[in-house]
Amino acid sequence: MIIATTEIQAINSFSRSESLSLKEVYGLIWLLVPIFTLILVIIIGVLVIVWLEREISAGIQQRIGPEYAGPLGILQALADGTKLLFKEDLLPSRGDISLFSLGPSIAVISTLLSYLVIPFGYHLVLADLSIGVFLWIAISSIAPIGLLMSGYGSNNKYSFSGGLRAAAQSISYEIPLTLCVLSISLLSNSSSTVDIVEAQSKYGFWGWNLWRQPIGFLVFLVSSLAECERLPFDLPEAEEELVAGYQTEYSGIKFGLFYVASYLNLLVSSLFVTVLYLGGWNLSIPYIFIPELFGKNKTGGIFGMTIGILITLAKAYLFLFISIATRWTLPRLRIDQLLNLGWKFLLPISLGNLLLTTSSQLVSL
């Protein structure tokens, strides 16, 4: 009897451990599926941005653009990435190899982490944190450290100058960007990205922060372009002055990682413009005409999720079009003009906007 009881207890404990292990496996799967789905969406989004930039720049310059790699040249970015993947990875003989190798990885990883707090639809966010927007600002401030490491580790005067410019530019425009985000948080009574979108949806189209914070929107727009180091703010990699800036000594896949980080940063900035100022996944305008169709993105379901994602991406790519058109139409600023714009104009304007927002919130109490 004792042996039988012992066997039964062993079988029961084994079945419990097996069920627990199955639950852990299922939990791990449900944790990894959204992450890999988000990474896949980000990769596709970056490929679309590269294709759009080439087509828009070709249209502005009155030329054809890519047309052989896939239909309408949409696979050209994959072809370029494959080429860089198989090119030789050269290392500077007198540089700091560890800093040289870590720099591109830090730039890419810090930008990827920013996507954790972006809501693509109702309940479609990996991490709905109470400090979501400030987490993005904190994470995005890590990327210039990677660029500075790349410039210093290259042991090249052009690379080091580019890294210093990247750090100075990031500090100059991070402060106005933070003040604009703080104004939005005060207006929405929350720092969660989901709560900010929900606060804008209460009043429909005219409740967007674009209309309630027009000054902050313009400052945020300019500051986000400067943070992405896009023309006319690409001083860290100015070809006429610094060859290629902090990228000068890089080749192969590490060289390609800088471009990946740049486009990832551009996409995440566009998504945050959508979330903070353009109502996120809420379309608002057609609610008057077809409320039963566009109201479903709040009730869940595959159809509602799809509608929310499409609305978010449509708004983000509208801002992307503006960014790409700006790059190919405006000349580059000088470094003194760049810093003066950040410290003497955008910083006082964003600070005044924050004071006005705080005053209006206190009066409304």
Swiss-Prot record:
GO CC term (a single one): chloroplast thylakoid membrane
One Pfam family it belongs to: NADHdh
Keyword vocabulary terms for this entry: Chloroplast, Membrane, NAD, NADP, Plastid, Plastoquinone, Quinone, Thylakoid, Translocase, Transmembrane, Transmembrane helix
EC number annotated for this UniProt entry: 7.1.1.-
Catalytic reaction list: a plastoquinone + NADH + (n+1) H(+)(in) = a plastoquinol + NAD(+) + n H(+)(out); a plastoquinone + NADPH + (n+1) H(+)(in) = a plastoquinol + NADP(+) + n H(+)(out)
Broad enzyme group: translocase
Signal sequence region: none
GO biological-process terms attached to the record: aerobic respiration; photosynthesis, light reaction
Transmembrane annotation, as ranges: 29-49, 106-126, 129-149, 250-270, 302-322, 338-358
Subcellular localization, as worded in the UniProt entry: Plastid, Chloroplast thylakoid membrane
InterPro entries membership: NADH_UbQ_OxRdtase_su1/FPO (IPR001694), NADH_UbQ_OxRdtase_su1_CS (IPR018086)
Annotated GO MF terms: NADH dehydrogenase activity; oxidoreductase activity, acting on NAD(P)H, quinone or similar compound as acceptor; quinone binding
Membrane topology: Multi-pass membrane protein
HAMAP family per the UniProt record, alphabetical: NDH1_NuoH
UniProt cross-references to NCBIfam families, sorted A to Z: PRK06076.1-2
Role, per record: NDH shuttles electrons from NAD(P)H:plastoquinone, via FMN and iron-sulfur (Fe-S) centers, to quinones in the photosynthetic chain and possibly in a chloroplast respiratory chain. The immediate electron acceptor for the enzyme in this species is believed to be plastoquinone. Couples the redox reaction to proton translocation, and thus conserves the redox energy in a proton gradient.
Similarity section: Belongs to the complex I subunit 1 family.
Subunit and partners: NDH is composed of at least 16 different subunits, 5 of which are encoded in the nucleus.
Entry protein name: NAD(P)H-quinone oxidoreductase subunit 1, chloroplastic
